[in-house]
């Protein structure tokens, strides 16, 4: 009897479990998640400038948004912001200096709810971004401060 039950239990299918994705830093609210991960510069561009006095530090910025927008004008404004305006809402604090990104490029074709972009800062050689600040001028994220110097 025991062998029959053991044999039957091995054939039962187990529902697949989705692994929870962990990010360097993330903040969430109902139906939305904003996250940040480090990104290898070679994915986006060169590691350093031509003179060699500065280096690039890249981050992957993700926005998962399941809020449905039905107004066509609002959709257009949102797209314009995500592609062109969001870059200017980011600031890196590096050794007490505030730096704006030099480049932001969206990853194409990720699906309706997920948007990811490579965000690149030019920093002095050997320096790291201590903090990234996001001041949302479009939506309702407000000001988000991502302290990175304690996260290695």
Please tell me what each predicted stretch does.
Residues 1-12:
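Sec-dependent bacterial lipoprotein signal peptides
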Residues 10-152:
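Conserved functional micro-motifs across diverse proteins
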């Amino acid at each position: 009897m025991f062998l029959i039950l053991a044999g039957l239990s091995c054939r039962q299918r187990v529902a697949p479990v989705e692994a929870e994705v962990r990010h360097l830093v993330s903040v969430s609210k109902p139906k939305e998640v904003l996250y940040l991960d480090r990104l290898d510069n070679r994915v986006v561009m060169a590691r350093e400038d031509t003179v060699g006095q500065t280096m690039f530090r890249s981050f992957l910025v993700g926005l998962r948004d399941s809020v449905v927008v039905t107004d066509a004008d609002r959709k257009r404004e949102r797209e314009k912001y995500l592609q062109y305006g969001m870059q200017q809402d980011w600031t890196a604090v590096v050794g007490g200096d505030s730096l704006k990104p030099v480049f932001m490029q969206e990853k194409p074709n990720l699906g309706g709810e997920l948007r990811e972009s490579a965000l690149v800062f030019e920093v002095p050689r050997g320096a790291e971004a201590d903090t990234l600040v996001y001041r949302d001028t479009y939506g309702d994220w407000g000001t988000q401060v991502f302290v990175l110097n304690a996260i290695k």
